[in-house]
Amino acid sequence: MHTPKHAIRRMSKGEMEFFEGRCQRMGEAERTVWGTKWCGSGNEATSGIDLGYFKNLDSCCRTHDHCDNIPAGETKYGLTNEGIYTMMNCKCESVFKQCLKDVTGVFEGPAAAAVRKIYFDLYGNGCYSVQCPAGGRSARTGGCPNGVATYTGETGYGAWLLNKANG
């Protein structure tokens, strides 16, 4: 295919970075729930305190996004995430579910209920629990540097089908 010369324009590195960033942000915005900046597979927030129109719902998603997790294909706590989605700590999932249940409002309440239904019932990737071996806690911090994780298994139909198809 031949591109006419009048359709080609050189651009500076700064212009190119601007357009690349804009395209990236547009792609991320399309993957977030309307009225939020944190709910979805990406985020469009400009900072950690930037929330969308549904502030309470968005706050739940922001907290969840920063929670303990194992990205797809990575290993942590001796557990390898062989799925195609990020696996979350079960404590985080429990807090997220309750946070979504606590969101009220004429529009925001039903939006939070929809996010909860899609995330836990359809997506439902499962989660992992971390146990600390006897005597494994740090006396100084109380942390468990050698924790061992166990996976709960998928809880939603969508994750089960996708992981089976790709595994």
Curated annotation (Swiss-Prot):
Tissues in which the protein is found: Expressed by the venom gland.
Disulfide bonds: 39-61, 60-99, 67-92, 90-127, 132-144
Record propeptide residues: 136-140
GO-annotated cellular components: extracellular region
Record family assignment: Belongs to the phospholipase A2 family. Group III subfamily.
Reported function: Phospholipase toxin, which catalyzes the calcium-dependent hydrolysis of the 2-acyl groups in 3-sn-phosphoglycerides. Inhibits both skeletal (RYR1) and cardiac (RYR2) ryanodine receptors (calcium release channels). Probably blocks ryanodine receptors by generating a lipid product.
Residue positions of the active site: 64
Coiled coil: none
Catalytic activity of the protein: a 1,2-diacyl-sn-glycero-3-phosphocholine + H2O = a 1-acyl-sn-glycero-3-phosphocholine + a fatty acid + H(+)
Main location: secreted
Record lineage: Eukaryota, Metazoa, Ecdysozoa, Arthropoda, Chelicerata
GO biological process terms on file: arachidonate secretion; lipid catabolic process; phospholipid metabolic process
Protein name: Phospholipase A2 heteromtoxin
